[in-house]
């Protein structure tokens, strides 16, 4: 099967012709062999029949002898005359010999009459008449094949004879035919059969050629069309001939339908590939723009993170400053306490003013010195309040920049700024009071020498100074509480800002990831564009 599949269909069809011709030749040879045998058999049968007929002549005359009509000699002579005259097929004759063997009568060669035949042999050394006698003795009748020259010729040719023993007279009657005419007849029939066989072979060759052409040519066209598609020519507009109703026509119809469907599919794929290329271009452009926007967003988030870090540092500075202010306030409170103690001491000294003016003057001078120092402390407090106000303003600005997450911090910053403003106002009032105290102390120093009334007024002023110091002490206590609140709020704000900073850093990381994803999308868009171009190039191979 695989060997046949390695041959083309046309060759296989011609192989059928070769096998058919070979079988025809074999059949012809067998038939010729049969004909050859039949010709020989026909000759032999014909000879047997004519010999049996001639033997009937002998039986007739022997019957006359038996009836007493003729003597044996007369009956034999008449029988010999009749048999001598018998002919068939123009020149064929009968002879008679006895069991001697001795020739009784030979019409074609009278010289053999009364001759001893035992020494006669054919060119092959075959003792013809001895074999005839032996056959007659054994079977009474039968064929004998040998070679014998034709009448008037010296060259022996093949001959077949049939002999029959006529027992009443002891004669053997026989007749033979030359088989060279059988060979001629066989050659004629061989020639006729060969001509018929050649004619049949030529007719079969013509039929096979027409059939092979009707099969191979459409198949070659189909194979060529398939090969063109497979090799890259890809002409999808090609159609095969579909005239007919055989399997090859059905194959062509199926191929045409397949090519038509493939043509439609490839056409749709070309349109889809073109649309895909355009979409890939749009995707690449959008991805590139998204990448740029993501990069800008990442840069802005880095800037926001930097600003938040600065705010964190500023808040930490505010916390430190608030802590320092609290320390300064504690120092001021201690100083106010000392001032109160000094005022009380001054009151005691004023009560003893009548005892010693010098001690009162000294006390007043001490009071003036303390007032001066308190003024310095108040300057520091005023400076701290101004810085706190400035820091609160900056914190409010940064909180406003932080948006919704910094709204609470903005409220706290506004409260701190208001507290700082009130602290500054109170400090200014205290400073004014200190200045007034100093002026009164100076007036008391000047007036202490002139009038006890002045001393009383000084005592009164000292009491007022004590009350003022109490008020200052209360204010300082309030400032200390406010500073503690500011420090606590600043600490909380620091935690909030740190949380904002972490969120901003996380957002910056997400922005970077978004930028990376946008870059990957851009790369994917470029790769998709290349793939769509390759697909378009592949589809351009098909002509639709």
UniProtKB/Swiss-Prot annotation:
Keywords: Cell membrane, Chemotaxis, Membrane, Methylation, Transducer, Transmembrane, Transmembrane helix. It holds the Pfam family sCache_2. SUPFAM superfamilies: Methyl-accepting chemotaxis protein (MCP) signaling domain. Disulfide bonds: none annotated. InterPro entries: Chemotax_Me-accpt_rcpt, HAMP_dom, MCPsignal_dom, sCache_2. It comes from the Bacteria. Its main location: membrane. GO terms for cellular component: plasma membrane. Residues 213-267 form the HAMP domain. GO terms for biological process: chemotaxis; signal transduction. Residues 272-508 form the Methyl-accepting transducer domain. The chain crosses the membrane at residues 12-32, 50-70, 192-212. PROSITE patterns: CHEMOTAXIS_TRANSDUC_2, HAMP. It is found in: Cell membrane. It is a multi-pass membrane protein. The keyword Membrane applies. Coiled coil: none annotated. Disruption phenotype: Deletion of the gene does not alter motility but largely reduces chemotaxis to acetate, pyruvate, propionate, and L-lactate. GO terms for molecular function: transmembrane signaling receptor activity. Belongs to the methyl-accepting chemotaxis (MCP) protein family. Chemotactic-signal transducers respond to changes in the concentration of attractants and repellents in the environment, transduce a signal from the outside to the inside of the cell, and facilitate sensory adaptation through the variation of the level of methylation. McpP is a chemoreceptor that responds specifically to some C2 and C3 carboxylic acids. Recognizes acetate, pyruvate, propionate, and L-lactate. This is Methyl-accepting chemotaxis protein McpP.
């Amino acid at each position: 099967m695989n060997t046949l599949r390695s041959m083309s269909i046309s060759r296989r069809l011609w192989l059928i012709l070769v096998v058919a011709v070979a079988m025809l030749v074999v059949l012809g040879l067998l038939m010729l062999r049969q004909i050859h045998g039949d010709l020989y058999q026909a000759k032999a049968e014909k000879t047997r029949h004519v010999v049996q007929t001639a033997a009937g002549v002998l039986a007739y005359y022997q019957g006359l002898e038996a009836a007493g009509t003729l003597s044996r000699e007369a009956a034999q002579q008449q029988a010999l005359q009749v048999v001598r005259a018998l002919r068939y097929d123009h020149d064929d004759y009968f002879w008679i010999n006895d069991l001697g063997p001795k020739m009784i009568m030979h019409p074609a060669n009278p010289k053999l009459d009364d001759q001893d035949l035992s020494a006669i042999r054919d060119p092959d050394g075959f003792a013809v008449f001895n074999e005839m006698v032996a056959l007659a003795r054994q079977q009474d009748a039968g064929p004998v094949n040998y070679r014998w020259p034709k009448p008037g010729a010296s060259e022996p040719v093949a001959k077949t004879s049939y002999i029959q023993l006529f027992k009443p007279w002891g004669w053997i009657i026989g007749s033979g035919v030359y088989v060279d005419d059988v060979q001629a007849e066989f050659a004629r029939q061989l020639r006729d059969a060969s001509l018929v066989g050649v004619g049949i072979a030529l007719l079969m060759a013509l039929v096979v050629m027409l059939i092979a052409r009707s099969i191979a040519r459409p198949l070659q066209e189909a194979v060529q069309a398939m090969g063109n598609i497979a090799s890259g020519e890809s002409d999808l507009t090609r159609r095969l001939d579909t005239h007919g109703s055989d399997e090859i026509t059905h194959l062509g119809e199926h191929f045409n339908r397949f090519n038509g469907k493939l043509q439609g599919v490839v056409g749709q794929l070309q349109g889809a590939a073109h649309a895909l290329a355009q979409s890939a271009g749009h995707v690449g452009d959008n991805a590139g723009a998204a990448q740029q926007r993501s990069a800008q967003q990442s840069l802005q988030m880095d800037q926001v993170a930097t600003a938040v870090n600065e705010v964190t540092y500023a808040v930490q500075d505010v916390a430190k400053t608030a802590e320092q202010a609290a320390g300064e306030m504690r120092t001021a409170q201690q100083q106010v306490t000392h001032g109160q103690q000094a005022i009380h001491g001054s009151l005691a000294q004023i009560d003893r003013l009548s005892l010693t003016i010098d001690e009162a003057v000294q006390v007043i001078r001490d009071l003036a010195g303390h007032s001066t120092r308190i003024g310095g402390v108040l300057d520091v407090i005023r400076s701290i309040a101004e810085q706190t106000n400035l820091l609160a303003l900056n914190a409010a600005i940064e909180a406003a920049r932080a948006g919704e997450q910094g709204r609470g911090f903005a409220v706290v910053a506004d409260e701190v700024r208001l507290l700082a403003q009130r602290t500054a106002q109170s400090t200014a009032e205290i400073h004014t009071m200190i200045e007034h105290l100093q002026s009164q102390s100076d007036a008391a120093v000047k007036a202490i020498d002139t009038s006890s009334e002045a001393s009383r007024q000084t005592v009164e002023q000292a009491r007022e100074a004590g009350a003022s110091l109490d008020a200052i002490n209360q204010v300082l206590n309030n400032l200390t509480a406010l500073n503690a609140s500011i420090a606590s709020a600043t600490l909380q704000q620091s935690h909030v800002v740190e949380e904002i900073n972490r969120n901003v850093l996380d957002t910056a990381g997400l922005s970077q990831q978004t930028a990376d994803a946008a870059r990957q999308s851009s790369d994917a868009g470029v790769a998709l564009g290349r793939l769509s171009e390759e697909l378009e190039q592949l589809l351009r191979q098909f002509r639709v």
